[in-house]
Design a protein with these regions (language model features):
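Hydrophobic face of amphipathic alpha-helices that form TPR/SEL1-like repeat modules
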Residues: 1-35, 60
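Residue-level signal for inorganic ion chemistry
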Residues: 36-37, 74, 96, 118, ...
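Conserved C-terminal structural/oligomerization subdomain of aldehyde/semialdehyde dehydrogenase
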Residues: 37-40, 227, 264, 318, ...
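Rossmann-like NAD(P) dinucleotide-binding subdomain of oxidoreductase/dehydrogenase enzymes
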Residues: 86, 130-273, 402
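ALDH superfamily catalytic-core signature
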Residues: 237-382, 445, 492-496
Length: 496
């Protein structure tokens, strides 16, 4: 008997052009990162399957049974998707847990977040206005928005159901057809979500889900002439390659890429509150988050005291069984990824860093069978060190002291990334100055990793382009059109 509900992913079939069937790629064996036990074998797509899905999506988009619906009619389907997600909340949370090893407490939140995302964009459809622009003569002018067409949505393995929802909900709301490419190692919850979408009333062919190798399927999707937009969340180098191909096609892209986010603790901060926030900002999700606060800047006057409290807190974090509600850190996604994290820690030590805690695999309670790694904190490195400049995507924090705002900002902004940042201070004027000067798309003040679906999310610099969430998020999946209505029968000027 399988240790979780597989009713939403029966037989490991995948959705290609409205049909649940076996893909023509090599089967993928999904395992549980906490103990390497078998989840199930999933069919995968190959290049031909990807091309078939795109052609079917284009045909489905051109039909009137989705793009031709009135906005409130599409909204009803999105509301129904949200309802079905919540009806299957616990099954989906456990499926997500088995997929990537996140603790059940986190996956429950992610499932609820996915439902809220569909609900929010349904509400947007009910309330979005078009613009009646000021006239410059005897004519009426207005701006309207139309679907783009076929959207390729490529999502990561760290929070699949939330990432899928953040692309599917606005893309479907906009009247588009979507070919979803989930990460190779986490196909399960994406397939389950597709079944929910069909049950809710998304017409056949409007959504396909193609598990498999990104280098194969992703390449077909990005290059295919019928794909009119790519929305990608993942590594910066892959995103850069997508942008190059898109430039040749003159195709719009949304890219949510890497990060190396600074967290700043000022000398007037509530240190206990800041300790809790810094620990959560880097070690929740085992550090496998693009927004993880992986660079820590602490004002020198409180550096020693703060670091003492922080290290003590890190050592108390509960690392282990993802089924336990009190677990704070689960395993990393794979043995290969854990080895990458270990190489970065070794590099940090070679560069002169001092290990304050962690830096090893935990033992006991069966954790040897999984891909666990202890929360790790280093100090004694300059911001120019590789471990401070390159995204590790794991539970590794590097701490550095700072003396004044000028030196702080010079270091915090000295990064190719610009995704997020956190500030801990009681001084709202200081918070305002620093927040406005930071070169990032999101800044948290006296909190971290909190999100509102109604607030746009974006990266600066090499952390990406485009917007997710908020009303701007739905417009990312629509194209604007201007209409001019003549109001008199006077001849046009050249005919006079």
């Amino acid at each position: 008997m399988t240790p979780f509900d597989t009713s939403l992913v029966p037989n490991g079939d995948i959705l290609i052009g409205g049909e649940w069937r076996r893909g023509r790629g090599a089967p993928y064996t999904s395992i549980y990162p906490a103990d390497q036990s078998l989840n199930l074998e999933v069919s995968t797509a190959n290049a031909d399957d990807a091309a078939d899905a795109v052609v079917a999506a284009d045909a489905a988009w051109r039909r009137a049974d989705w793009a031709g619906l009135k906005p409130h009619q599409r909204a009803l389907v999105l509301y129904r998707i949200a309802e079905l997600i919540m009806q299957r909340h616990e099954a989906l949370a456990n499926l997500q847990r088995r997929d990537n090893g996140k603790p059940i407490g986190e996956t429950r939140v992610l499932v609820a977040s996915a439902a809220n995302t569909f609900r929010y964009f349904a509400a947007c459809l009910e309330t979005l206005d078009e613009e009646l622009t000021p006239s410059r003569g005897d004519y009426l002018t207005m701006s309207v928005h139309e679907p783009i067409g076929v959207i390729a949505a490529i999502t990561p393995w760290n929070s699949p159901i939330a990432s899928d929802a953040q692309k599917l909900a606005p893309a479907l709301a906009g009247g588009n057809a979507v070919v979803l490419k989930p990460a190779e190692v986490t196909p399960l919850v994406s397939l389950a979500l597709a079944r929910i979408c069909e049950e809710a009333g998304v017409p056949k062919g409007v959504l396909s889900v193609l598990p498999g190798k990104g280098s194969v399927i992703g390449d077909v999707l990005v290059r295919h002439p019928l794909v009119k937009k790519v929305s990608f969340t993942g590594g910066t180098e892959v995103g850069r390659g997508i942008a190059r191909i898109a430039a040749e096609k003159l195709m719009p892209v949304s890219l949510e890429l890497g990060g190396k986010s600074p967290t700043i603790v000022c000398d007037d901060a509530d240190l206990d509150h800041a300790v809790n926030g810094v620990l959560y900002g880097i070690f929740s999700s085992s550090g496998e988050a693009c927004i993880a606060g992986s660079r820590l800047f602490v004002q020198r006057a409180v550096y020693d005291e703060f670091m003492q409290r922080l290290v003590a807190g890190a050592r108390k974090l509960r690392v282990g069984d993802p089924t336990r509600p009190d677990t704070q850190m689960g395993p990393l996604i794979s043995a290969k990824h854990r080895e990458s994290v270990e190489r970065y820690v070794a590099l940090g030590l070679e560069e002169g860093g001092r290990l304050l805690c962690g830096g090893e695999r935990p033992s006991g309670d069966g954790r040897e069978r999984g891909f666990f790694y202890q929360p790790t904190i280093l100090e004694g490195l300059p911001n120019s060190a590789r471990i401070c400049q390159e995204e590790i995507f794991g539970p590794v924090l590097v701490a550095m002291p700072f003396d004044d705002e000028a030196s702080l900002l010079a270091q915090a902004n000295d990064s190719v990334f610009g995704l997020a940042a956190g500030i801990w201070t009681r001084d709202y004027k200081r918070a305002w100055r620093i927040a406005r000067a930071l070169e990032t798309g999101t800044v948290w003040i006296n909190t971290y990793k909190l999100f509102s679906i109604s607030t746009p999310f974006s990266g600066w610099k090499e952390s990406g382009m485009g917007r997710e969430k908020g009303r701007l998020g739905i417009r990312e999946y629509m194209q604007q059109k201007s209409l001019y209505w003549g109001l008199n029968d006077a001849p046009l000027p050249w005919a006079n």
